[in-house]
Amino acid sequence: MNAQPLLPRIQSPADVRRLSRAELKQLADELREFVLQSVSRTGGHLSSNLGTVELTVALHHVFDTPEDRLVWDVGHQTYPHKILTGRRDRMSTLRQLGGLSGFPRRDESEYDTFGTAHSSTSISAALGMALAAQQKGEKRHAVAIIGDGSMTAGMAFEALNNGGMPHAGRVPNLLVILNDNDMSISPPVGALNKYLARLLSGRFYAAAREGAKSVLKSAPTLFELARRFEEHAKGMVVPGTIFEEFGFNYVGPIDGHDLDALIPTLENLRDKPGAQFLHVVTKKGYGYKLAEADPIAYHGPGKFDPQIGLVKPATPPKTTFTQVFGQWLCDMAAADPKLVAITPAMREGSGMVEFHKRFPERYHDVGIAEQHAVTFAAGLACEGLRPVVAIYSTFLQRAYDQLIHDVALQNLPMVFALDRAGLVGADGATHAGAYDIAFVRCIPNMSLLAPADEAETRRALSTAFAHDGPVAVRYPRGSGAGTAVETGFETLPWGRGEVRRQAGGHVRGPRIAILAFGTLLYPALAAAEKLDATVANMRFIKPLDAALVEQLARTHDALVTVEEGCLMGGAGSAVLEALQAAGLQTPVLTLGLPDQFIEHGDPALLLAACGLDSAGIEAAIQKRFCASAPSHLRPVANG
């Protein structure tokens, strides 16, 4: 091994392409150690990045990036890619406000050819790039790197179906790399597979195959027999028949940590025309024993000491909203045998581990397939079961037609537990739950609740489960106010909010009522203390408590709505619609997320930047209303 470190000398992939095979292996070792040390200091995705080190090195060595396009599916496994493409010195800013994104972004680097974070988009995007190159007469390569988990989504197969077809007379030059890190569809990887990969990707095999085809096509029966024999022979040692049927030349599986296998295979596939499919097998957490042993725990850890590993905090943290949901789900399942739970590959993130253990026959993980998850749940509801779909707010976007056509149109009794609603912090714009209020409340038959804290979240879930129709309950990532959660199934009065703070009888300025939706109730209450304003905990976005809105409008000089969602079509819009229907012209200030994508960073900092912390709410109200004349309206007691 070279005594001098190689990684500090790598300023771009051009430097990687100059290295020898031995140096590439050394670089991979240094890169893996750098990823481990870096993520341990910043937090972030670890297991997946440790598993893609050799593949990343090989890709940048073989392909002329950024002229050749690499499209990484999901994108949370791109830390090695970022490090090799000139961003090593900025890794200390990863996922922080103003720092590097945890995902590929076109505005961050020319090497990030396509922005990703949601799954199963890479093949479609790479195919578009390949066809664009073909149409413009440019001789560059397009490569999609997709994990086996992402292959469960229909979009990936839609792209494969299209990618192997001739376009303008020929199949585009597209390479799809299946990064199989779960061994779920792989036979043992050994010398035979390595040899076969080199053989099937090589020029001699391709030339012999095409030559034999041209001869045998003159005798159709012999050609069909030969085709079946080839398919059977390859199927004995490789599981690629389905990809061959899509029109791809399948190669693999090969060891994704073996540069001696990866590099010659990639070179062969680079030089072959048409649609190619390479199956590589990797191991999540590779090279760090603790992550190899528990890749789920090390999927997205916070800061930790690599020598010790993850350590449980001495004092247990506050209960999270996700944990409240998980406990409610188990309790309700014990009480009602009709409850079934569905998740699109988010068992841990959605708090369903315990439910899976206790009720395995009523637990359905459908994989990364949100469209299927929603319609599958609709089918369960049609047969009298009570499905609960646990899904992140941002991922429900992927099943919007199913939500309308298959659920709401039939008014099926279902619960959608929308985790990660609002700002999500380090994952940034791609994962923000900013739009669910707007896109759910406009659907007929759909109801939407926004509980203010942990205790109310449990009651909201029970309320939704008891309702005869589709209901979504939105709640944020992390913990809330720390309220004690009861163990029963108390419900909320349907469609009713409550006044949590009443303004005093002698307000100096205009009488203000703040209508808070969701967890922003607490910063609204803090702001109201300084303003002596009324605060309503609205609870329901749809059906909106129009009677409470009208009452507050008649007894206050102005209303302020506060929500952790986009303003266009949001809860504030619902209040304005209610006032219009009542013929009231009370001034309204709507506060929420601005009309822009919110960057990654600490959630508290992001909330403050959006003016949704207590100081921001107070300042916005002061600026808009508090120079007005004193009010002559009298308060009305909470009904």
Curated annotation (Swiss-Prot):
Q: Which cofactor does it need?
A: Mg(2+); thiamine diphosphate
- Extract the Pfam families matched here: DXP_synthase_N, Transket_pyr, Transketolase_C
The record's Gene Ontology cellular component field reads: cytosol
Q: Which InterPro entries match?
A: Dxylulose-5-P_synthase (IPR005477), THDP-binding (IPR029061), Transketo_C/PFOR_II (IPR009014), Transketolase-like_Pyr-bd (IPR005475), Transketolase_BS (IPR020826), Transketolase_C (IPR033248), Transketolase_CS (IPR049557)
Q: Which residues bind Mg(2+)?
A: 148, 181
Q: What is its EC number?
A: 2.2.1.7
**What keywords tag this UniProt record?**
Isoprene biosynthesis, Magnesium, Metal-binding, Thiamine biosynthesis, Thiamine pyrophosphate, Transferase
Q: Which CDD domains match?
A: TPP_DXS, TPP_PYR_DXS_TK_like
Q: Which residues form the signal peptide?
A: none
Q: How does it assemble?
A: Homodimer.
Reaction(s) catalysed (UniProt annotation):
D-glyceraldehyde 3-phosphate + pyruvate + H(+) = 1-deoxy-D-xylulose 5-phosphate + CO2
Q: What is this protein called?
A: 1-deoxy-D-xylulose-5-phosphate synthase
Q: In which pathway does it act?
A: Metabolic intermediate biosynthesis; 1-deoxy-D-xylulose 5-phosphate biosynthesis; 1-deoxy-D-xylulose 5-phosphate from D-glyceraldehyde 3-phosphate and pyruvate: step 1/1
**Entry-linked Gene3D superfamilies:** 3.40.50.920, 3.40.50.970
One Gene Ontology molecular-function label: 1-deoxy-D-xylulose-5-phosphate synthase activity
**Protein's job:** Catalyzes the acyloin condensation reaction between C atoms 2 and 3 of pyruvate and glyceraldehyde 3-phosphate to yield 1-deoxy-D-xylulose-5-phosphate (DXP).
Protein species of origin: Leptothrix cholodnii (strain ATCC 51168 / LMG 8142 / SP-6) (Leptothrix discophora (strain SP-6))
Question: Bound how, and how many: what does the cofactor note say?
Answer: Binds 1 Mg(2+) ion per subunit. Binds 1 thiamine pyrophosphate per subunit.
Family, per the entry? Belongs to the transketolase family. DXPS subfamily.
Detail which positions bind thiamine diphosphate: 76, 117-119, 149-150, 181, 288, 370
Might you name a Gene Ontology BP term for this protein? 1-deoxy-D-xylulose 5-phosphate biosynthetic process
Is Transferase found in the keyword set? yes
